[in-house]
From Swiss-Prot:
Residues 233-253 are annotated as: Linker. Its cofactor is Mg(2+). It comes from Afipia carboxidovorans (strain ATCC 49405 / DSM 1227 / KCTC 32145 / OM5). The gene is glmU. This is Bifunctional protein GlmU. GO terms for cellular component: cytoplasm; membrane.
Amino acid sequence: MTDRSSLTLVLAAGEGTRMRSSRPKVLHEVAGRSLLANVLLAAPAGKQDRLAVVVGPDHQAVADEARKLRPEAQMFVQSERKGTAHAVLAAREAIAGGADDLLVVFGDTPLVTAETFARLQAALTGDVAIVVLGFRAKDPAGYGRLLVQGNELIAIREQADASEAERKVDLCNAGMMAFAGKSALTILERIGNANSKGEYYLTDAIGIAREMGLRAAVIETDEDEVRGINTKAQLAEAETVMQARLRRQAMEAGVTLVAPETVFLSADTTFGRDVVIEPFVVIGPGVSIDDGAVIHSFSHVTQSSIGKKVSIGPYARIRPGTSLGEGVRIGNFVETKAAVLESGVKVNHLSYVGDAHVGTNANIGAGTIMCNYDGFDKHRTEVGAGAFVGSNSSLVAPVKIGAGSYIGSGSVITREVPEDALVVERNEQVTRPGWAKRYRERKAEMKKPKT
């Protein structure tokens, strides 16, 4: 933590053409969150911290995503793409507004952590005007090299301009930078475009700061944290890294992952104590899982609240709007959606529970379907506490099943069932003794060869 004020500037104006997608690059997702969201939620968010996002002229969706997550964020448009420094100066108004520290980060680096933002700020001490985030690359080819003398960064050399000796340097530029607020705008406004592309490069700030008698420094982080996303392949690589991070955090918090590499979590998944997740489970966004819950193999859960000691699966699908109370049992091939199941409810086999409220200790038999859609609108089903719904029943919504009532197997329920009543809605069984034997004999006679 620091008592200095900050302005975090997120550069999110890139086209992302190599993604081969109509969606803006920073809105692609890692662990159930957009690339941009992962960056914004890692950025400083204290009372003294401000946030600005630079977007492209046709990227209203990017601005909307940023405001959804950080409503206080200022938006700036980079009308022409003329380099990284040009993008930063698109937010000149925000920079001029003043802050002790200016933090610049790309919106396509979803693995960056809050700790790294804090370390960048902490390194802005004394006459250090710029701090650059670096990493040791396994293969530095293509990266800008950070050239250091002692504790001072003297230059960022791009691959094409590097000497043979400089190309052997494995300390590379991650793209994330911090500026001392008092000198930031002066340095940025001195960056020119005298290069082959006619663009304004943020990396030129190092030389300008040194010409002003100021120092630049480097802090290092792991290569995985600063992965930039430009292709779908890189998106998949970032997902792999993020999932490994989330699994490790979950296990360190006491969650049992039987086969961690087969479980997929979301960045916002929350766990209680003694949760067990079996192999091949997918947890989508917006899920909380309380103490002692067990999610069995091949289950999918998203935007739902899972209560204490709940058992789910195997092969269950828990869809958005589901709330499962303590001790609820959801068995194999059960699907729930927009449903509240109070404590002790059992839905053990082959059922659909949608747009419903199921009271405490009710039992929903195998093959029960809540028929919630009439082709135009969704309707709700209410099942009272302690009700027993027999196997292969259809509850045609809107309908209310009274507390303590019994529904006979195979029934189609279209009207309200009173409390403690028995309802059986099916044709009376007809038994014809000897019919099957006579039928087989007749069929066998018909199949005999004709002479």
